[in-house]
């Protein structure tokens, strides 16, 4: 995979990014001289829709300048690849499923609650903040250990 563009990843399901959010993202990317690569769903503001294998997704994340997402996978891939990111929180409305509970739990466990927002305009300030990935990696390691132990006990019966 050889990518020469400087890009940000927009990882969101199709239809979840509003017209106003798409316009803001497009303006933001232009200001930062970045292309917008959409993964997870086609987006109006994307310069490119990336349709790739699960194995290639992490390579795209690893090479991104930053990430905007409203998904669990977009958030955790950003963490794993040590990218600056913002997670957009969607509230549940009527029969539509929000992401607040799942993403709040993940990011609070990793002490990254400051990466969440409900307002697209917050992305620039959030993505400019440094992340102590050494600390985050230690927290992630501890949570993995607990999860593995839980699974081991359940499998042993």
Give the label of every model feature segment.
Residues 4-157:
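Active-site anion-handling motifs in enzyme catalytic cores
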């Amino acid at each position: 995979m050889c990518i020469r563009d400087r890009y940000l990843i927009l990882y969101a399901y199709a239809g979840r990014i509003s017209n106003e959010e798409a316009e803001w993202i497009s303006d933001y990317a232009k200001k930062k001289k970045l292309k917008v690569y959409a993964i997870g769903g086609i987006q109006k503001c994307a310069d490119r829709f990336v349709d790739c294998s699960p194995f290639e997704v992490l390579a795209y994340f690893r090479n991104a300048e930053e990430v905007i997402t409203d998904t669990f996978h977009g958030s955790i891939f950003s963490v794993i690849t040590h990218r600056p990111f913002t997670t957009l929180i969607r509230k549940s409305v009527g029969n539509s499923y929000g992401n607040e509970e799942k993403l709040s739990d993940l990011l609070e466990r990793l002490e990254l609650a400051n990466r969440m927002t409900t307002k697209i305009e917050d992305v620039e300030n959030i993505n400019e903040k440094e992340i102590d990935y050494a600390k985050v990696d230690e927290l992630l390691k501890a949570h993995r250990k607990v999860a593995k132990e839980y699974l081991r006990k359940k499998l042993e019966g």
